[in-house]
Amino acid sequence: MKKKYHLTPDELQLFKESIAGAKKLRQDTIVHHTPPKLGKKIAPERLLQEQVDASYYFSDEFQPLLDTDGPTRYVRPGVDNFEVKKLRRGDYSPEMFLDLHGLTQKQAKQELGALIAACKREHVHCACVMHGHGKHVLKQQTPLWMAQHPDVLAFHQAPKEWGGTAALLLLIELEE
């Protein structure tokens, strides 16, 4: 990049003389945060395995038994029902978001598998999946897919601030 303004030696000397008595101010009003570290590179083999897992866990033929009355919800057997209540109340804040608007079922299935794998990799316990309303294809299919995945502990229709009836909050099981 070229400098736009060229100072002559006389102008530079004049500038130095004009600021000679100035003291440096201590900046104490703005907290500077260090930028987040970039994640490690993910091995191509691991990405391929995550894609294979996504197609393995999500079947279009299998129909898990979900409650049809009230909001969409699911809790894996052996998990406390209080977890679903905490999701409903908004006690968990989603750290990752997935928007499925405009995707086909195949694309949505892959993205959902990638989200769950990313949550496990990044140690994210709660995520939000926005399936939208549309023609209700993804709205009906998304809970069926999520109930099949072994790493999903529970999910519930999201509170209004995170999408309401057009989104689901899900809890992911993390390794200790």
Swiss-Prot record:
Keyword Nuclease listed: yes
Enzyme class: hydrolase
InterPro entries, per the entry: Smr_dom, Smr_dom_sf, SmrB-like
EC number: 3.1.-.-
GO molecular function: RNA endonuclease activity; rRNA binding
Family: Belongs to the SmrB family.
HAMAP family in alphabetical order: SmrB (MF_01042)
NCBIfam families: PRK04946.1
Protein name: Ribosome rescue factor SmrB
The organism of origin for this protein: Yersinia pestis
The encoding gene: smrB
